């Protein structure tokens, strides 16, 4: 299904007409194989503007959000054309995707892990920060899962896919 994403007419209430455009999307098309999830979407989101994306299931909302912080890179079947500028910079040309994700976050309604084990999902951030020591990672993973009240449930299946956890 192809969804049309449109910005509200005019500038949102409480946002100045001359407010800085923080996010520009131009002619964005998202495809899975030959099927378009979105086609030729263009919009501007201004500083301090509150912007919502609504639509029916399978209309391309999540696909759109994943492109904003380059989470689409985790899906080899997802092809993105068009331009996305954040603070005037093309997000596809940014070398540090983690810095981008620290500025553009996406919170999904249900927990969504990466296609890795439970252990690797929890250890991802420390590893990206340069931590390599297995003993240190083990301590961090156990501490994080304990704080999330999950340790007792998953301690014997840390090598299982995180996506297999019930929601």
Can you say where each PLM-predicted feature lies in the sequence?
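ABC nucleotide-binding domain signature
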Residues: 52, 66, 83-84, 98-110, ...
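ABC-family P-loop ATPase nucleotide-binding domain
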Residues: 1-29
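Conserved ABC ATPase "signature" region
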Residues: 83-90, 134-156
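The feature captures the beta-strand-to-loop junction immediately N-terminal to the Walker
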Residues: 54-56
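ABC ATPase NBD coupling module
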Residues: 76-79, 89-105, 128
């Amino acid at each position: 299904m192809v969804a049309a994403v449109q910005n509200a007419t005019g500038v949102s209430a409480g946002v100045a007409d001359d407010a800085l455009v923080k996010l520009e999307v131009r002619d964005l098309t998202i495809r899975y194989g030959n099927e378009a999830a979105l086609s030729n979407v263009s919009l501007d989101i201004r500083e301090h503007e509150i912007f919502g994306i609504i639509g029916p299931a399978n209309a391309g909302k999540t696909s759109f959000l994943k492109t904003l912080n380059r989470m689409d890179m985790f899906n080899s079947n997802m092809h993105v054309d068009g331009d996305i500028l954040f603070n005037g910079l093309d997000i596809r040309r940014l070398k540090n995707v983690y810095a981008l994700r620290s500025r553009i976050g996406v919170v999904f309604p249900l927990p969504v892990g990466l296609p890795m084990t439970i252990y690797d999902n929890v250890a991802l951030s420390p590893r990206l920060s340069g931590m390599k020591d297995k003993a240190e990672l083990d301590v961090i993973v156990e501490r994080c899962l304990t704080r999330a009240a999950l340790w007792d449930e998953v301690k014997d299946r840390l090598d299982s896919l995180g996506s297999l956890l019930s929601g």
